[in-house]
Amino acid sequence: PVKPRYEFKRTARGDGETFDVTDVKCPDVTAAYRLFKQREIASDLKETVCRLSDSSYDDAANQNMPSMQYELPDGNVIDVGVERYKIPELLFQPELVGSFGLGGDAPDLKNAKGLSQLVLENINRCDVDVRKDLFGGMLLAGGGSLFPQLRERLEAELHDAAPTNVRVKVTASQNAIERKFATWIGGSILASLGSFQQMWMSKQEYEEH
């Protein structure tokens, strides 16, 4: 038999009578599936209400920022306050995770490097001849890039750190779906090209090398 892998936690009303479904749990909902759904909700919350500060996070300046409401799948509405600035700030200043009270089970991030520092270091590891092109041709992709103000913040920090004669340009699709799944979209376009068969390596060739 096909067993549903979901659960209901709300009240459903029909004509003439009310059915209270308060906590009906399907016995076959695995812990892994429950964790997957929890992370899916957390990702949506992150991409919906969180945003980067224009410059390095300042606790005093952000305390008066208005909170935003987020509706959970069960209908409950929560207010997200200054945390909506703190969470994305960890991309640039991961060492603040402890002072933000967001540590939990997170690994020690004292020596972790921020996004702009990682980008700068990787560009500087490349040949001098291509660095100018790399600074001027950065593309944001993936779900983590959906934070509002991320592109502007990254571009500003790299501009301050880059050589004075280099133009820094960070681009990102305005379409959230395209940005989130850019790698898959790019892969599908590449795979559809007639010349793609000349680019791949067979299993036999791979094993030979």
Q: What role is predicted for each listed range?
A:
Residues 1-209:
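C-terminal region/appendage detector
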